[in-house]
Amino acid sequence: MATPHINAVEGAFAETVLFPGDPLRAKYIAETFLENVEQVTDVRNMLGFTGTYKGKRISVMGSGMGIPSCSIYATELIKDYGVKNLIRVGTCGAISTDVKVRDVIIGMGACTDSQVNRLRFKGQDFAAIADYSLLSAVVESAKTHGIQTRVGNVFSADLFYTPDPEMFDVMEKMGVLGVEMEAAGLYGVAHEFGARALCVVTVSDHIRTGEKTTSDERQTTFNDMIIMTLDAAINL
């Protein structure tokens, strides 16, 4: 039952899918943390895998960069493959001095400069929020693992190279924790089609200070985030 962008067979995906932007990161997660792994889709090299984690069937698939790409895959996973839970796992940039590089952020809500949710909400402002049961499960898992998290708003930007850097001042004033490019679209799709979604990201760089993580630091922090998320996923 292939879709225009996914060539998996019916039943290939688990009810819960971890959803990194990078398909190679999806491959890394599958090969590092899952057992009995099978690659289930590879259209446009947007790789997807299904395996087991501590006996629980889990899938992982790349979403691509930005709301349009993420929304395509999220829609098809939910509507055509029956996926119930989508958890974005990725990275973000920080803007506030209170937020540090390597912090783990859980996106309770997602602000955006994109118009996609206004389009689906007939011109009105839609509150793009995470599913509470997913959020609380990941928060509790983080506590169990001793991983400190920050819970609040992220900002899903349409432009990576923004022409309006003064907007960062507004974001900081309004308490936005991190800037990424997918969560608002993912939350909108999930609400539209009756699924549950959450965004969990690590801070890879600081927009204000220019501080960046090394590749080794990024991988270590990312691994901690994945383990905490997977341990939450098996209890959904």
From Swiss-Prot:
Gene Ontology terms describing biological process: purine nucleoside catabolic process
Sites where the protein binds phosphate: 21, 25, 44, 88-91
Pfam annotation, one family: PNP_UDP_1
Catalytic activity: a purine D-ribonucleoside + phosphate = a purine nucleobase + alpha-D-ribose 1-phosphate; a purine 2'-deoxy-D-ribonucleoside + phosphate = a purine nucleobase + 2-deoxy-alpha-D-ribose 1-phosphate
Keywords, alphabetical: Glycosyltransferase, Transferase
InterPro entries named among the record's database cross-references: DeoD-type (IPR004402), Nucleoside_phosphorylase_CS (IPR018016), Nucleoside_phosphorylase_d (IPR000845), Nucleoside_phosphorylase_sf (IPR035994)
Site positions (Important for catalytic activity): 218
Taxonomy, superkingdom: Bacteria
UniProt-annotated catalytic positions: 205 (proton donor)
Gene Ontology molecular function: any one: purine-nucleoside phosphorylase activity
UniProt cross-references to NCBIfam families, sorted A to Z: deoD (TIGR00107), PRK05819.1 (NF004489), PRK13374.1 (NF009914)
Family according to the record: Belongs to the PNP/UDP phosphorylase family.
The protein, known as: Purine nucleoside phosphorylase DeoD-type
Lineage summary: Bacteria, Pseudomonadati, Pseudomonadota, Gammaproteobacteria, Alteromonadales
Gene that this sequence comes from: deoD
